[in-house]
């Protein structure tokens, strides 16, 4: 896979950019705050339609304008692809591949696979489950289109459920829809748990040897996926996981109503790592994090 060129309009700090890349190795350099990371973020966005540091697409649009544009010319699968993303403040984004509008971001899967490493990746060790879930989502979305579809649907359902829990005391009729949203969230959530658990298992097969080499043979790394307590085997099929997620939802139903917060589901899952029997601590130099239990 080769990124041949990149064009940006009103993306982050770029009013307009046209860049052509060498098919081998490219070194991006410049002053602080000049836009190096923004450029790499744009390339990665064409891979998954997700940003490693922005929760909402509007965060990537330059202040004072209504939309941004990202376009990349890519060589992949022995074919040329033109990938485009149009971001809008007041409307849904639009994704295009070779002039054809894509229905979902999952259709980008496999066209441009990227690996992005940045200082924020240390949050995988130093911070909580949210950073780890973002890492999983970014990686799996490139490999499994069905995962991206399930994740988008789950996030949509989650936003609806949050509004129900927030407003039900002022509008009791909202409670009649809660069970339906719980069922649909459990159905998509079962797929998410299944895919995440299998990804961590594959990571566990290769990451320890790499970590051992980096540490000069002094440390051993192990990874373990954790989900809600009622799921006995996250590697099981989605049909097996579904009733276990429903059980967890039911057990937390009253607590959710009382707190007006969503307390159950894959949104609460994470994964843990151990290095030579210890876990990361919250504060340490960037070169080597210290250790404490991760959530």
Q: Residue ranges of each PLM-predicted region?
A:
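Conserved adenine-binding aromatic site and its adjacent loop/helix in ATP-hydrolyzing domains
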Residues: 41, 138, 294
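ABC transporter nucleotide-binding domains
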Residues: 24, 42, 111-113, 135, ...
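Nucleotide-state sensing region of NTPase/ATPase domains
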Residues: 48-131, 135-147, 204-209, 241, ...
């Amino acid at each position: 896979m080769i990124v041949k060129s990149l064009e940006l309009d009103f993306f982050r700090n770029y009013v307009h950019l046209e860049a052509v890349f060498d098919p081998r190795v490219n070194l991006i350099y410049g002053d602080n705050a000049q836009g190096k990371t923004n450029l790499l973020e744009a390339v990665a966005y064409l891979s998954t339609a997700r940003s490693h540091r922005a929760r909402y697409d509007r965060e990537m649009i330059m202040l004072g304008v209504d939309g941004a544009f990202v376009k990349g010319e890519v060589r992949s699968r022995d074919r040329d692809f033109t990938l485009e993303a149009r971001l809008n403040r007041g409307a849904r984004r639009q994704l295009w591949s070779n002039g054809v509008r894509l229905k979902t971001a999952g259709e980008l899967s496999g066209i441009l696979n990227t690996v992005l490493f940045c200082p924020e990746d240390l949050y995988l060790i130093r911070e909580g489950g949210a950073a780890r879930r973002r890492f999983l989502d970014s990686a799996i979305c490139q490999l499994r289109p069905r995962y991206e579809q399930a994740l988008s649907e789950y996030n949509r359902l989650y936003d609806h459920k949050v509004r129900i829990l927030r407003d039900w005391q002022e509008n009791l009729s909202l409670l009649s829809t809660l069970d339906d949203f719980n069922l649909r969230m459990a159905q998509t959530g079962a797929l998410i748990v299944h895919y995440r658990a299998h990804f961590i298992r594959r990571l566990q097969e290769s990451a320890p040897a790499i970590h051992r080499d980096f540490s000069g043979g002094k440390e051993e790394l192990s990874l373990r996926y954790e989900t809600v307590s009622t799921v006995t085997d996250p590697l099981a099929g989605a049909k097996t996981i579904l009733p276990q997620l429903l059980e967890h939802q039911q057990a937390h139903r009253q607590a959710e109503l009382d707190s007006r917060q969503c307390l159950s589901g894959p949104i609460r899952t994470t994964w843990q790592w151990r290095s030579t029997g210890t876990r990361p601590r919250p504060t340490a130099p960037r070169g080597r994090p210290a250790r404490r239990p991760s959530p």
